[in-house]
A protein has these predicted regions:
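Extended, compositionally biased non-globular segments that define protein topology
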Residues: 2-166
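N-terminal secretory/membrane-targeting segments
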Residues: 141-287
Length: 287
């Protein structure tokens, strides 16, 4: 009797194209940004940055390999793994974004970790509610978070403070002004981007593309559950002032310092919360 394996190599045309695209993109980036592979030692001499070379090449090879694999799993197992990835990946995304921005993440208390995790989970839950597919939620949530983190890094470099909620009202002006700056990616950005590609590729392979055996009622219930979680998180973070209970507060006069001490996402969400100021009793615009 032939033993059934849940993991096997699947050299199909689509898999080869995906693997080739990942390999080509990572190789082109490595060549174009080759200075990232070098660093100066204490004497000022150039030497190979081993951690970057190993991390970049390792993640590139891993992403390429994942594209060539096929996971033969039961539908229920795929569904469970998909939900688990949507719940766990916001945590790793938080780590990637804060490492890119150089916050004091490894000194954060458990409450601050939870606060940042909930902020990212809100984004992923919204993406899942819109698409009802784990791989799409991971792709959209991860891309939005990583883009925000990279943009925040450059904004801090240019003006000395992070992205703030009210900056979104002048987004067009910011795009016009940003054309005059030079953007040089960092090693952490490159490694973070490849990690994101690995997670999306793994989720596409493992999580269900769709559940044809599931009823329409199940699909509706699944979407409503994701919307309910998103709504509950939004209410907890904003009207109920949940962030303050998790030791999250910002200094209006030192936004950069605040974001380094409490996390990029938590700092942004806390500032957004402060914009929702209740109208004082007896206030009248005509007065």
């Amino acid at each position: 009797m032939k033993e059934k394996r849940f993991l096997r190599l699947n050299p199909s045309r689509g898999n080869f194209l995906a693997a080739g695209a990942v390999l080509l993109a990572s190789a082109v980036f490595f060549i174009l940004e080759w200075p990232l592979a070098l660093e100066e030692d204490a004497s000022g001499q150039q030497r190979l940055c081993w951690w970057y070379v190993l991390a970049f090449s390792g993640l590139g090879a891993l992403a390429t390999g994942i594209c060539l694999l096929q996971f033969d799993l039961p539908g229920a197992a795929r569904q469970a793994i998909g939900w688990l990835l949507v719940l766990l990946l916001p945590l790793s995304t938080f780590v990637v974004v804060d490492v890119i921005n150089g916050t004091k993440i490894w000194q954060f208390s458990g409450r601050k970790w939870l606060a940042n995790y909930l902020c990212y989970l809100l984004v992923f839950a919204l993406a899942y509610a819109l698409t009802r597919r784990p791989w799409a939620a991971v792709a959209i949530g991860g891309a939005a978070s990583l883009t925000f983190g990279i943009a925040n890094y450059f904004v801090v470099q240019f003006r000395g403070q992070p992205i703030l909620p009210w900056d979104l009202t002048s987004f067009g002006t910011a795009l016009t002004v940003s054309g005059g700056y030079e953007y040089v990616p960092t090693r952490k950005m490159a490694v973070g981007a490849l990690y994101y590609i690995c997670t999306v590729a793994f989720c596409v392979k493992v999580a269900p593309q769709d559940a044809p055996h599931a009823s329409r009622r199940f699909h509706i219930a699944e979407r409503l559950a994701a919307l309910s979680i998103s709504g509950l998180l939004a209410i907890t973070l904003f009207p109920l002032n949940g962030l303050s209970y998790l030791d999250i507060s910002v200094w209006a006069w030192n936004q950069k310092g605040s974001s380094e001490l409490i996390g990029i996402a938590a700092s942004f969400f806390a500032n957004a919360q402060y914009m929702m100021v209740d109208t004082p009793d007896g206030y009248s615009a005509r007065a």
